[in-house]
UniProtKB/Swiss-Prot annotation:
Residues engaged in binding Zn(2+): C130, C133, C150, C153
Protein name: Adenylate kinase
Gene symbol of the encoding locus: adk
Described purpose of this protein according to its UniProt entry: Catalyzes the reversible transfer of the terminal phosphate group between ATP and AMP. Plays an important role in cellular energy homeostasis and in adenine nucleotide metabolism.
Chief location bin: cytoplasm
Binding-site residues for ATP, renumbered to this chain: G10, A11, G12, K13, G14, T15, R127, T136, Y137, Q199
Catalytic reaction equation(s): AMP + ATP = 2 ADP
Record: residues binding AMP: T31, R36, R57, L58, V59, G85, F86, P87, R88, Q92, R160, R171
Organism: Moorella thermoacetica (strain ATCC 39073 / JCM 9320)
Amino acid sequence: MRLVLLGPPGAGKGTQAREINQRLAIPHISTGDMFREAIKRGTPLGRQAEVYIKGGRLVPDEVTIGLVQERLVQPDCRNGFLLDGFPRTVAQAEALDSWLSSRGERLDAVIDIEVPRDALLERLTGRRVCRQCGATYHVRYNPPAVPGKCDACGQDLVQRADDTEATVNKRLDVYNEQTAPLVNYYRQRGLLKEIDGSQAIPAVILAIGRALGRDWQ
């Protein structure tokens, strides 16, 4: 199956992507991982992307799209793929559709994991990280034995700058502004599968399976 995975920060996309990867035996293609691999291998597009990333600039669509195409022709994508982090805009979605069509292919579905904003805020702002060993906790869902202290090494736990309420709200605003047109684009094409991501993790993957016509009991 050829799939796209959408969802805001904190929606649990990584967890669900691993489940989908295992159940459908298709590669999980994260844009971030794809950039890092292309840069590491020193491909022409990877070198172009590196210039923009090192300069703190957005990688242009033509470079990103080229990298995606480069990745999707690899042998492990013969039976499908799960794209995560691409497309981000309608222009990218149109480019992907056009390229797939030129190969006689099309997307099978777009999975949109939806979680209420207050739940996302709780998930993200509650994260704590050990400044010494990097172990991660959550004040509600995975608290340390001693509040504020790492179970592994006893050092202080801190909240990352990315996880403050102001920063999380900004990230969610940017995501919603950027993704709303994309969601509408795929809804109009009958590809969108909206999934309640506020359920327990096992329930979410079962819901994804049902949306794809699979019985993953």
